[in-house]
């Protein structure tokens, strides 16, 4: 099996080895020889990698369990590929399988394609500089079955999931139009700098909505289950986290400055996720969506926001759980029309599982609790 690429492979890369992630210096499971005349790579020996957790080669990591047919050592000439307007084309032997390894690049805007040997496209995707940032230094690609990360410099990560619309082929080579993800769902929870001035105002009223402090996501679909989990604290940029809010979620302004991720990178990722998700799920999820959308517009501008092209189905576990918890509504104004109040996340969780969940008001803990509640509520409704 050969892997052919353009002549923009790094000329100093003569040989690569693949090993388990935790054992970089031993137990090699595959060797790749760079063949300059063929402008690509020839796989010299190839053991089965599907059971290997987190294989890695020379600082270029593969995350998760990756099927052996998509272990591909991409090593690009960054300046020529990512800074040009060319479309890099990757041909992977005679591979026409249904699984396509995702690839993440950085450029002003660049369209990539993966083709089979008959020049039929298996996948294509576009990344833009606004969404994922830009750097020519210390790039490290993480190539996985469902998503990819970039390490821009040191340990500063930006996250992106290249949701691919692709023209695939079945085992007999017949084309199948569609997407590798079916019914993509995004579970989301946020922690913020405070509360909105008016809950009823739209997210476009930016002064009304608080800033994002922490956001956690669980992304899944019908075909593959959970595709990604992300837990991100944002580095404050032009605002600060009030002590009153920090007392609730435990993230002080100094901590966010120290450990937070670049705001633009996180926002670019969130915009990609929202623009590709079919369903968005959470507890009091309208609040989370308004906060995230307002932040996307602050960073990118509404004219560049990708999520505006998507009409999501929104599912709120708070509303789903109201008639399960049946907590009396003591509000004089709404009691007659709504005898039960909306449950807090922990109230719903306790009702469903007869226990409290830990680390409340941590976005990752909250989104996991909402995820568990959603599927338990679905089970009870069957």
Report residues per predicted region.
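Metal-dependent phosphoesterase signature
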Residues: 247-268
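Short, surface-exposed loop/turn motifs at beta-strand boundaries within globular domains
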Residues: 181-183, 210
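Short acidic, Gly/Ser-rich segments with clustered Asp/Glu that frequently serve as metal-coordination loops
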Residues: 190-198, 203
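Metal-dependent phosphoesterase core characteristic of DEDDh/y 3'-5' exonuclease domains
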Residues: 198, 208-215, 219-251, 271-382
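Short glycine-aspartate micro-motif
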Residues: 185-187
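A generic structural signal for short coil/turn motifs at secondary-structure boundaries
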Residues: 100-102, 257, 358-359
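Short linear loop/turn motifs
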Residues: 78, 128-132, 260-263, 360-370
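Residue-level detector of conserved, function-critical positions
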Residues: 1-180
